[in-house]
Structure formats: C-alpha cells, structure tokens
C-alpha cells in the first residue's frame, strides 16, 4: 500500500514531467500494478525525494536538467515483466511514444531514453570526470539514485530484499539467492558503487556493509 508521503512525492515527480495527464495516468496505472512490490510508486517517490535533497550539491537542480532527470526517474521502471531481459529497452520505448508530442527536443527525449536504457547495467556507465558535461553527470546521477536503496540501514535493506523476492515468484529460493548474491558480489567488487560524490558520501559505506553482511560465507 502506498504511503501518503510516497503518494505526495510521486505526484510531485509527475508534476515535473511535461507530458499530458493521460500519459501520466497510464504511467501511474503501470506503477501501481499488484505485481509490483519494490519497483512501484514508492521506489520512484524515494528517488525523487533523494534527488531533491542532494541534487543542489552536485549542481543538478536547475530547472532544465531537473525536468530531464524527473522524466528518467518516472519512466525507468515503467515496464517490469518478470523473466524478461529487455525491460529497460521496452521502458525507453514507452517513454519515446508517450513523449512524442511533448515540448521537448529530440535530443532531450533521446537523452531520457538512453538514460533509461543505461539502468540495465548501472556499473557499465563510465565514471564521469568532475568537469564532464552536465548531461553526462546527470545520467550518472540517475543511475546512482537508483542504487541508493542498497545503502539503506540493515532493516530497510532486508525489507527491500523481501519485496524484490515477491516480484519473482517464478524463481525458486535457490535461483533467487544465486542471482541476488551474484549481483551483490559484482557491486562489492566494483571500485565504487556510486560515481557522484554526494551520494557516495551518503550511501557507499552502508551499501558495502550490506554487501559484506549478505556475502558472508558465500
């Protein structure tokens, strides 16, 4: 069940997405599907809260770039079909169709689509230099925001693990644990989980503590 806080922040997120009400209603319906336990309204609301809290420190709170960040957050998980490996590509396609008549340039629309596609493998995106173009840093920011739940306190991290398990009932416990631990191991082996200094300062240490706790004896 969506909390009042999550509903408020999800609505605030949608208010920054320059699409017609019909498109926003369709997105809301997708995100409120009964099959979504983790990748739903609450997840998007959390990312938007964290963006609003920390973006200014990274120089990413100006209206133009914030609009694009809002669009990427809003649509990055809009297609979430268990067992498929093309959810990100299909989410990008939904975004491109929904935004076809939006007051955005083709460059802007494609930036959002490519950012959505990049969430298929957060670690594959190169670490942008401190003086990198704004849009390169903004893409890394969206990817890092999406990983911030990995840096939650123990109890919240464990609850997220339970919610993720509910989204894949077709897997056995052994299959789920194998995939989950492989993902955590890859993150643990990475030099950095978060490429943006502000989010690294807030979440890196706790994320690595969570990985270590989960991988003990693995």
For each feature predicted by the language model, list its residue ranges.
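Active-site metal-coordination segments of metallo-dependent hydrolases
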Residues: 34-46, 80-90
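Histidine- and acidic-residue-rich, metal-dependent catalytic cores
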Residues: 91-126
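Secondary-structure capping and boundary motifs in well-ordered enzyme cores
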Residues: 39, 63-67, 108
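Divalent metal-dependent phosphate-bond-processing catalytic cores, especially two-metal-ion Mg2+/Mn2+ enzymes
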Residues: 1-13, 32-39, 49-61, 75, ...
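Short alpha-helical hairpin
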Residues: 13-30, 43
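An amphipathic alpha-helix signature
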Residues: 7, 11, 24-25, 48, ...
